[in-house]
């Protein structure tokens, strides 16, 4: 895979998260840091999952869920459903991320931290998420130490 590092402007955009498990919750928590409209769709959604979404539908994914969506996080435990979501979303010009399945990803969500307008992001291209998180943490610690770069 060959990923171009970019930052997407999701301000006031619609983001769809399909699934109600741990991966979906992690993406919802990530998205809560941004000003976007989040719809979560899944047959089983926990109260915690619901608190991070603007809109929710406790039901199976439907193709109509893709209408007006900017990006999709396909977090279902059903790989075939994730594959269908990717195929249908891509046909509509929508980018898809499928956690733990880089083959189905159009984009990756790097490990990052922000300090005001500055953001540092680290990605392993989907090959070693734990290492990317460790690098992010080490960089943040380094910048927070004697250099005084991060208060």
Predicted regions and their residues:
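Short, ordered loop/turn segments at secondary-structure junctions
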Residues: 43-45, 61, 101-104, 125
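Short beta-strand and adjoining strand-loop segment in the mid-core
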Residues: 39, 70-77, 118-127
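Short amphipathic alpha-helix with an adjacent loop that forms part of the alpha/beta core around
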Residues: 60-68
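Glycine-rich, charge-decorated loop segments at or immediately adjacent to ligand/cofactor-binding or catalytic sites
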Residues: 105-115
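ADP-ribose/adenylate-binding Rossmann-like module
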Residues: 71-75, 82-107
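Hydrophobic, well-ordered beta-alpha structural blocks that scaffold small-molecule cofactor pockets
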Residues: 1-44, 48-52, 56-59
């Amino acid at each position: 895979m060959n990923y171009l590092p970019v930052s997407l402007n999701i301000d006031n955009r619609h983001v769809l998260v399909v699934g109600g498990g741990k991966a979906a919750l992690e993406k919802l928590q990530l998205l809560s840091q941004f000003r976007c409209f989040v719809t979560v769709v899944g047959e089983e959604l926990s109260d915690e999952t619901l608190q991070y979404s603007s809109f929710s539908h406790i039901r199976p994914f439907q193709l109509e869920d893709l209408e007006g969506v900017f990006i999709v996080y396909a977090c279902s435990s059903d790989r075939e459903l994730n594959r269908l979501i990717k195929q249908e979303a891509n046909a509509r010009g929508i980018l898809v991320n499928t956690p733990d399945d880089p083959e189905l990803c159009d984009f990756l969500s790097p490990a990052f931290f922000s300090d005001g307008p500055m953001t540092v992001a680290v990605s392993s291209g989907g090959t070693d998420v734990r290492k990317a998180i460790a690098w992010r943490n080490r960089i943040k610690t380094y910048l927070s130490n004697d250099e005084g770069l991060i208060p």
